[in-house]
Amino acid sequence: MDNKDYKKFYLIREDVLPESVVKTLKIKDALKSDPTLSIYDAVKQFDLSRSAFYKYRETIFPVDDKMLDHREFTLILYVTDIVGMLARVLDVISKLELSVLTIHQSIPMEEKATITLSLNAKSKETSVEDVIGALRNLDYVSKVELISMSM
């Protein structure tokens, strides 16, 4: 592949996207859910120029839309070192019906540790946000971060 054809991809939270990009996503959703809606009417409904819509429409995709074929992702959890913490995490993963690809638990230092999980959600419609939310709700989990995903 020629370097000039190579495009980098970034994972970015919606709340930091420019308004025109967020509106483009909303328009794409509206067009997908209502096949009778024209692009002209959709951009008018969301108060976005057609040129802005055309500029972004093929460059922005919700994470879950791109993960439908390959729903593998890696999370890192920052936890307090207590007996059974890994078991609690794995119990949540099991209840969400996810497959564990790899697990790494760091050696605790100053009663803190990290757990890195590579997961596969291919057989389930669970979103990454659902998984992160469920793990964040566990006692003794101070932070959960998405560190990679396959697309």
Curated annotation (Swiss-Prot):
InterPro entries: ACT-like_dom_sf, ACT_dom, UPF0735_ACT_dom-cont. Residues 74-149 form the ACT domain. HAMAP family: UPF0735 (MF_00707). Belongs to the UPF0735 family. This is UPF0735 ACT domain-containing protein SAOUHSC_01752. The lineage of its organism: Bacteria, Bacillati, Bacillota, Bacilli, Bacillales.
